[in-house]
Amino acid sequence: MSIILAKKSGFCYGVKRAVDTCLKIKQNYPDKIIYTLGPLIHNNDVVDFLKTKNIFSIGYENIDTLKEGDIIILRSHGVTLETIQKLKEKKLNIIDATCPYVSNIQKKAQKYYKEGYSILIVGDKNHPEVIGINGWCNNSAIICRKAEEIEDLPKKICVVSQTTEKKEHWISVLSKVVNECREVVAFNTICNATEVRQLSAEDLSKEVDFMIVIGSKSSSNTTKLYEICKNNCSNTIHIENAGELPDYISNKYSKIGVTAGASTPDWIIKEAIFKMSNKNLNEQLEYMENNDIQISIGQEVEGEIVSIVSSNEAYVNIGYKSDAILLLSEVTKDNDEDINNFVKKGDIIKGKIIKLGSENKPPVISVIELNRENAYVELKEAFENKEKVVVKVKEDVNGGLISIYKNIVRVFIPASHVELRHVDDLSIYKGCELTVNIIEFEEGRNNTRIVASRRDLLKEEQSKVEEETWSSLEKDTIKEGEVRRLTDFGAFVNINGVDGLLHVSEISWGRVEKPSDMLKVGDKIKVYIKDIDKDKKKLALSIKDLTKDPWKDVEVKYPVGNIVLGTVVRFASFGAFVELEPGVDGLIHISQISHKRVDRVEDELSIGEQVKAKIVEVDGEKRKIGLSIKEVNDI
């Protein structure tokens, strides 16, 4: 005969935590009677064991018999919010041993009820866990175990599950809800330990001749284990302890399977196996001992994400007697992040144990600590080999940017190394990913100083672009550029990373006093490459050469003897210059303004004034046109 114990069976984390909490409280108060509000867990043997320690279960109806200062422990299944308020009013010493998974469901029910959602609980309406959850949404929840039990559904609904419910029930109910409701928020709150235990029992029950399910007859999860096993193995029995084992089993069956509910302690399982095998120890007991792994600080472990209880924490099944907790701070250094952005339920992760578990708290696992050493090695290699790395900016500080590498290692970027030019507001980089070079890696006794530069990479990129641009530029071609800088003598125009000078005299055929009168920084303009010296990296540009020289054929356009209309644009001591068209000015000599004596030009004319004048001279080669106002007046 062989006895096979299911790989996952017996106490779950929440149950063990509740029992351990009771025993620890008793150690702290050895002379006091301790009370639990209802049976601490669904296991009569454990409840009887607690009685021997002066830890007694009382019903809700007996709360009024308690006195101020009495110790009352909330059962692992949780209680209603109203019950907690009543206990507080009596000024009792309340110890909360509610399973963390159940507490999570209670908080969700309360939150979404306050936001206007109807709450639907997939589970047994008479189970204390479900009764407790319902109490966190004003006892208004819709409670069912199967889809066919639901009739009229509200349009806005939040769905949760009893932690020990069958997955098939959850799926059937959720399918109906999704099809009939307009707005659905659903949380699969079936405890992973329950699901794993059920799968393990199902697999084992298909392989054996006889199946034994150990646990309280009042335990919901144990009853479900029995139903699952019975479906696969007709020779399945449900017992509470070894005393209920039939005598014929050992002689009649050669392959016996054993599983146990979440409220069944190891000693009850061992007692049952011992009775069947008639040995002090056998392979299955050894398996139980070996399966109860030991952990130590710094130990590398691998596990599965079994639940994400908030934006800051998740639980990981590492094969230990309780799940480990993974905090956001142990995944990333960015406190503004959400742990859901890094892990999902079902993910397999690796980490290091950084805190051992206690009676009331699970062990803590860190992804950061496992990856930190590798991250430092990578950054050191990047520094030595001058390789690029990508960092994410966390915040701007006086003097630069604080960034993180792989959500673990702090890297500082000085303000002068962020861009090629000075940046006034560094806050615009918060949350951005930047590619940088490590320019300083200094290992100290207590920390490592790491400094990076983005400017150096930008310089390299700029140099590459400049070289490509210089290779492509040719004299007497037209390019598009951007005005980057203005001076009194011209404008600097950038063409694909190369700056060229647009002299003030090349902006227009007309007279330009200041470049800023015609252009502004940021303007996109077309320019003519007037001259280029690739060796000296000099580029002369022109806008006016994009248009025809207005002095060409000027004798034809402005024949001598004709009257022309122009605009006075500037004065000289010897006369006034009149613009005939952009780039073509004529001179009215002071002697040609009037028949009377003119001492000052500005006494007779004003800037911007339009005047008629006779063309008296045209010299295209010397770019001169002589005009006369007084000869117009003679006509």
Curated annotation (Swiss-Prot):
Organism: Clostridium tetani (strain Massachusetts / E88)
Cofactor binding, per record: Binds 1 [4Fe-4S] cluster per subunit.
Reaction equation(s) it catalyzes: isopentenyl diphosphate + 2 oxidized [2Fe-2S]-[ferredoxin] + H2O = (2E)-4-hydroxy-3-methylbut-2-enyl diphosphate + 2 reduced [2Fe-2S]-[ferredoxin] + 2 H(+); dimethylallyl diphosphate + 2 oxidized [2Fe-2S]-[ferredoxin] + H2O = (2E)-4-hydroxy-3-methylbut-2-enyl diphosphate + 2 reduced [2Fe-2S]-[ferredoxin] + 2 H(+)
EC numbers for this chain: 1.17.7.4
Classification via Pfam families: LYTB, S1
Start and end residues of each stretch annotated as 4-hydroxy-3-methylbut-2-enyl diphosphate reductase: 1-279
InterPro entries in the cross-refs: LytB/IspH, NA-bd_OB-fold, Ribosomal_protein_S1-like, S1_domain
Pathway info: Isoprenoid biosynthesis; dimethylallyl diphosphate biosynthesis; dimethylallyl diphosphate from (2E)-4-hydroxy-3-methylbutenyl diphosphate: step 1/1; Isoprenoid biosynthesis; isopentenyl diphosphate biosynthesis via DXP pathway; isopentenyl diphosphate from 1-deoxy-D-xylulose 5-phosphate: step 6/6
Residues at which [4Fe-4S] cluster binds: C12, C99, C191
GO biological process: dimethylallyl diphosphate biosynthetic process; isopentenyl diphosphate biosynthetic process, methylerythritol 4-phosphate pathway; terpenoid biosynthetic process
GO molecular function term, any single one: 4-hydroxy-3-methylbut-2-enyl diphosphate reductase activity
Record: residues binding (2E)-4-hydroxy-3-methylbut-2-enyl diphosphate: H42, H77, H127, T163, S219, S220, N221, S263
Protein name as annotated: 4-hydroxy-3-methylbut-2-enyl diphosphate reductase
Keywords for this protein: 4Fe-4S, Iron, Iron-sulfur, Isoprene biosynthesis, Metal-binding, Oxidoreductase
Binding site for isopentenyl diphosphate: H42, H77, H127, S219, S220, N221, S263
Gene3D superfamilies: 3.40.50.11270, 4-hydroxy-3-methylbut-2-enyl diphosphate reductase, catalytic domain (3.40.1010.20), Nucleic acid-binding proteins (2.40.50.140)
Positions contributing to dimethylallyl diphosphate binding: H42, H77, H127, S219, S220, N221, S263
Cofactor: [4Fe-4S] cluster
Family of this protein: In the N-terminal section; belongs to the IspH family.
Class of the enzyme per the UniProt entry, highest EC level: oxidoreductase
Active-site residues per Swiss-Prot or TrEMBL entry: E129 (proton donor)
Domain of life: Bacteria
Function: Catalyzes the conversion of 1-hydroxy-2-methyl-2-(E)-butenyl 4-diphosphate (HMBPP) into a mixture of isopentenyl diphosphate (IPP) and dimethylallyl diphosphate (DMAPP). Acts in the terminal step of the DOXP/MEP pathway for isoprenoid precursor biosynthesis.
Domain S1 motif: start-end pairs: 298-373, 380-455, 476-544, 561-630
